Amino acid sequence: MKNVGFIGWRGMVGSVLMDRMSQENDFENLNPVFFTTSQAGQKAPVFGGKDAGDLKSAFDIEELKKLDIIVTCQGGDYTNEVYPKLKATGWDGYWVDAASALRMKDDAIIVLDPVNQHVISEGLKKGIKTFVGGNCTVSLMLMAIGGLFEKDLVEWISVATYQAASGAGAKNMRELLSQMGLLEQAVSSELKDPASSILDIERKVTAKMRADNFPTDNFGAALGGSLIPWIDKLLPETGQTKEEWKGYAETNKILGLSDNPIPVDGLCVRIGALRCHSQAFTIKLKKDLPLEEIEQIIASHNEWVKVIPNDKEITLRELTPAKVTGTLSVPVGRLRKLAMGPEYLAAFTVGDQLLWGAAEPVRRILKQLVA
């Protein structure tokens, strides 16, 4: 049974990973060792009924060297500090990472097994030892419309994202909720009075959002009652943000198409959802296909994608973050041909940023490695 070290298991993604591994009884097939950046020597948690002893220091290279597999959700700074030191010792175990630091390295594979199991299997045969979870929007896009890529039907795709606060971290989620609460408090008495002017209410809310003391330390701007059309840093040579660049770079790496890439681009926008990312796609298909056939191709790709009929009532019920949060379901709806021509397709999808967007691909590659 393989010795598997877990780092960053207390954080948001790590906690979701622990929950999913417990639900699927994954701890039965491995010996867990838990690491910490600040509390070495304290009692380790118990998952799957296994006593893992005491917490070990996440910076102790000698302890890390003893492991067959390391799973880290600690973030890119930790990876950048520890990974090269560990590899320099000759350690030859598997490194599984939820952070972005190693994604584009030649000796790393971005994992999303319902989409790129062929790439993963080939990498394992070649002796690849580094496996990294992908960008959340990219993974959720490929889970949603992977069938179109699998059938080589996509000429190009333009994406507009509607990304949840969770993608920016736990502090950002708290800030969003604080903003929402303050906006309601600013007009709570007026909301109770049906005779109050909605324009007066709007003016008060807007003034509150613009106030110097409105909490924006994490997002840098109001998100509650607003949106932020910018995620990550600017890439000056293209005008893209790094999040937008990932759509192209990671999609093609996941699919094994880096030598013959499919153009993927668009705009990434932060909205006031808590943990589900939504995306609107404009897709140029390589050929005109009947909509019914397109729906069948999408729906049959994996067991989690679900085609939602282009009907208002069903869409409002099934195709929202409120519905999808906390589930592995990846619904795709608003499917229709666009006025630009019969080979142009519109689609809209929603997916949980912490599940298929982060923890689940990591859980599933770990399951393969311990098998």
From Swiss-Prot:
Keyword Transport tagged: no
Residues binding phosphate, per UniProt: 103, 246
Record keywords: Amino-acid biosynthesis, Diaminopimelate biosynthesis, Lysine biosynthesis, Methionine biosynthesis, NADP, Oxidoreductase, Threonine biosynthesis
Chain residues that bind NADP(+): 10-13, 37-38, 74, 166, 353
Entry keyword annotation includes NADP: yes
A GO molecular function held by the record: protein dimerization activity
SMART domains xref list: Semialdhyde_dh (SM00859)
Family matches, as Gene3D superfamilies: Dihydrodipicolinate Reductase, domain 2 (3.30.360.10), NAD(P)-binding Rossmann-like Domain (3.40.50.720)
Active site: 136 (acyl-thioester intermediate), 277 (proton acceptor)
Pathway named in the protein's UniProt entry: Amino-acid biosynthesis; L-lysine biosynthesis via DAP pathway; (S)-tetrahydrodipicolinate from L-aspartate: step 2/4; Amino-acid biosynthesis; L-methionine biosynthesis via de novo pathway; L-homoserine from L-aspartate: step 2/3; Amino-acid biosynthesis; L-threonine biosynthesis; L-threonine from L-aspartate: step 2/5
Notes on the domains: Consists of two domains, an N-terminal nucleotide-binding domain and a C-terminal dimerization domain.
Protein name listed in UniProt: Aspartate-semialdehyde dehydrogenase
The organism of origin for this protein: Haemophilus influenzae (strain ATCC 51907 / DSM 11121 / KW20 / Rd)
